[in-house]
C-alpha cells in the first residue's frame, strides 16, 4: 500500500483505515506486506520520518498477531540523492531511525533512483544512520522513466554481498518475457548471448543490442544516412519476419 499522499490529515483515523485494509487482505490469505512512502511531494524533514517510523511500528505490532506475516517498507528518502547526497545529515532518516522497528526490511535504490554502481560500502554507510536490514530495490532494468526503451543486457555495477543486504528486488518492465530474461541475468550463470538464444531471439538482434543493453551504456554513433537506413531495415525485418510472443513485446520499441 502507498498511503503517503494523504496520510496525516487525521492520523488516528488513517491508521485505523490502514489496519482495516491489512486485516481484509489477511482474511483472504495474504501474508507478505509492504508500505511505500516513496514519491511524496513534501519536505523530507525529521517529523515526517518520525511519523513514518511510528506508522510502521503500529502496523508491525498489528501484523505480528499472525506470526507468518511479513512487513517491509520504502522510505521517502530511498537513495542518497534524495538526501542531497549526504545521508549522514538527512533529517528524514534521523527521524525515521528513532521510531521505526529496526527488524523491518527497508528498500533502498543506492546513490540514485537508478544507480550505476551499488556496493557493500554504500550499505555500510547507510547502516551508520539506520540499522534496518536493507533490500536493494534495483531500478537497473526499469523503464517507467523512459517508456520508449527497454534493457536486456548484463546486470552490471553491483558488488554487494549477502553479509551487507537481506536481498535484491528488481524493478522491471511489466513485460513478462522481457522480465524473465532479466531475471536470468540476475541469476548470473548464463551470458547475454546464451539467454537471448534460450528465448529464441534472432541473431540479427545482436546488431541492435547496443541500443538495448543497459541504462549506462552509450549507444553507437550513427554517422551516415546509410548507417541509419541499415538499422531501420533491420528493425523492420525483425518486426515482420520474427514471429514469437517475445517479438510482440518488443515490436513497439523496434519500429
Model-predicted regions and their roles:
Residues 21, 31, 40-190:
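Catalytic-core regions of glycoside hydrolase
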